[in-house]
């Protein structure tokens, strides 16, 4: 591992093959087009044709008849005083020269490359003859590797100040790219750096498209599009290291976050749906097959986990929905499990927590799924109004549809995570129904909080302690395992499990 001056570790930039898992880095640029100018001022289009396995070029002026509408855009960002190369969004192939768009904010992208070297030393040919392997393979690889190395860095959050190893190691930083510190425990992101201008993968969607096979190592943030290393993301409570956005958590991770270790007792684990209305998928995947797919994918039997546990020593009944199981949709099994949980909490006088993450009622079960809204609400009425017990509703992103319209908004205390999406219908549906435009943030937690829909916006790392304090205010205290009260509590659970 190299060090730079000042004792800071350099970031990983040069080992392109290690990052992308390819032997020939030109395969990454099969759809990129470059505008090249030589010493004589002549301009060319250059691109890699993956089908012909060759690096092709075509004179700039040959595009006038076919792409005259795009020439002003191209000329506008070509430098007049020096040799420059610029990346053009929406790449070409030899059979497809339909569109050229300028990438925002990448003027002088290759400030430290002089294309005289490419045109003179590499025998850059005009027409459609281009470079051919194997004679030019070394030159092409060298050029493309330099391009990638100057633009792609594996970097941690700026200012981490730690000297620990990163998870992907590199060797050096090229040109004027700035070095970043590296630290274990801080997830990595792909950044680009040019003369102090920082570009994220939001501006480089092609890189993500070409590396999907390696995304099992990374989780992309829905807000900033930064990449988070999955091995450390769980220890960070699935919060984006780049922008602090609260990413989706699995139900198992949420139970681990809220419930004390060794106190979790699940309920109704073996309850599964049997396709009650024989849903017609219209030639698509059958409902039973979809259920089986998500059961294998998530390890769950349904879109909710319910059970009994302790939160900082306080016994609670808790249900946690999982959006990764068919979008957390509420069918007859989900409704039945939540109803049974509420009834058990009513009988045992336990505080109730339900964590919502759902797109709404499950269409494959028709009116049976809609009926769950009334069934759960009825059980909650007995729990809250007749027994006077405490129900805390926690809304996470996304919570929508029938869940929002029923138990999601019926809590005695409603807590929402920062920037969570909470809605009944989607923005597009509302605009088409009302025939008017609504603000983009009108369904975010902060906007709705100021309208009075929620009681608290609590970040994930404070959630457990805040709920514990709320229960204490309602005269619910931790159990002493040596007390008679704890023995009575365990005796109540034994007949159930």
From Swiss-Prot:
Stored InterPro entries: AcCoA_carboxyl_beta, Acetyl_CoA_COase_Trfase_b_su, ClpP/crotonase-like_dom_sf, COA_CT_N
Residue intervals of every C4-type zinc finger in the record: 221-243
Essential cofactor(s): Zn(2+)
E.C. no: 2.1.3.15
NAD listed as a keyword: no
Subcellular localization: Plastid
Keywords for this protein: ATP-binding, Fatty acid biosynthesis, Fatty acid metabolism, Lipid biosynthesis, Lipid metabolism, Metal-binding, Nucleotide-binding, Plastid, Transferase, Zinc, Zinc-finger
Pathway named in the protein's UniProt entry: Lipid metabolism; malonyl-CoA biosynthesis; malonyl-CoA from acetyl-CoA: step 1/1
GO terms for biological process, alphabetical: fatty acid biosynthetic process; malonyl-CoA biosynthetic process
Keyword field contains Plastid: yes
GO cellular component, one term: plastid
Catalyzed reactions: N(6)-carboxybiotinyl-L-lysyl-[protein] + acetyl-CoA = N(6)-biotinyl-L-lysyl-[protein] + malonyl-CoA
Cited Pfam families: Carboxyl_trans (PF01039)
Signal sequence annotation: none
Annotated PANTHER family: ACETYL-COENZYME A CARBOXYLASE CARBOXYL TRANSFERASE SUBUNIT BETA, CHLOROPLASTIC
Family recorded in the similarity comment: Belongs to the AccD/PCCB family.
Role noted for this protein: Component of the acetyl coenzyme A carboxylase (ACC) complex. Biotin carboxylase (BC) catalyzes the carboxylation of biotin on its carrier protein (BCCP) and then the CO(2) group is transferred by the transcarboxylase to acetyl-CoA to form malonyl-CoA.
Assembly and oligomerization: Acetyl-CoA carboxylase is a heterohexamer composed of biotin carboxyl carrier protein, biotin carboxylase and 2 subunits each of ACCase subunit alpha and ACCase plastid-coded subunit beta (accD).
Protein name: Acetyl-coenzyme A carboxylase carboxyl transferase subunit beta
